[in-house]
Curated annotation (Swiss-Prot):
<comment type="similarity">
    <text>Belongs to the UPF0246 family.</text>
</comment>
<dbReference type="Pfam" id="PF03883">
    <property type="entry name" value="H2O2_YaaD"/>
</dbReference>
<dbReference type="InterPro" id="IPR005583">
    <property type="entry name" value="YaaA"/>
</dbReference>
<dbReference type="GO" id="GO:0005829">
    <property type="term" value="C:cytosol"/>
</dbReference>
<protein>
    <recommendedName>
        <fullName>UPF0246 protein PBPRA0561</fullName>
    </recommendedName>
</protein>
<dbReference type="GO" id="GO:0033194">
    <property type="term" value="P:response to hydroperoxide"/>
</dbReference>
Amino acid sequence: MLIVVSPAKTLDYDSPLATQTYTLPELTDHSSELMKVCRELTPMDIASLMKVSDKIAGLNAARFAEWQPEFTTENARQAILAFKGDVYTGLAAETMTEEDFAYTQQHLRMLSGLYGLLRPLDLMQPYRLEMGTKLANPRGANLYQFWGSVITEKLNAALAEQGDNILINLASNEYFKSVKPKSLDAQLITPVFKDCKNGNYKVISFYAKKARGMMARYIIDNRIKSVDELKQFDVAGYYFVPAESTRKEFVFKREEQVK
């Protein structure tokens, strides 16, 4: 079973590392090509393109300028420990054991606008480049055209390496659009998390992101191999709803959260 998740905008390069083990990202030739384009952007260009504040634009212009083709423990850290959004709160990688990290390295992949596809222990220099960014580049008008079939081919290689053909899509629509499902050698399953709010069940972004991380961790902790085992996911009050689920989309619901 292979899990795919989105990256996070929030990064952490300060907390103590839960492991010293690391690998190097595999698509850095592509990243370097993108970085040439990014380095031509002024802070004003970045603010407009990414729809961010002047402060964040300045920070990311500096990150682009400082980015190096050589990755070391001085200028980078493992991707799974560098990302710090809602998904990664649910995943809680800082509590993993060395055995967990080894398992995760084989069974989890992170999509990325700059790095394409990251393994958990791949060193990552800080950046912000969301997959939906309309960044014109030598391969097209946006990052989907830039990455083309590269990410899908990498996912197929990872699927073959880890031993079965089940791909669990815990990424956002923005990021999963970088994957070509028809070219995947996989049974693709997309879990959907619905929370009750005022009597209605709907996807609430904050809760759904955290739930994606919790499901990834559930798969890792329990070394889950089968689709039926995945349906047993019951963390934080979620439960599988067979009547609303299909072969490709698993619906999980949760009752209203009391604050």
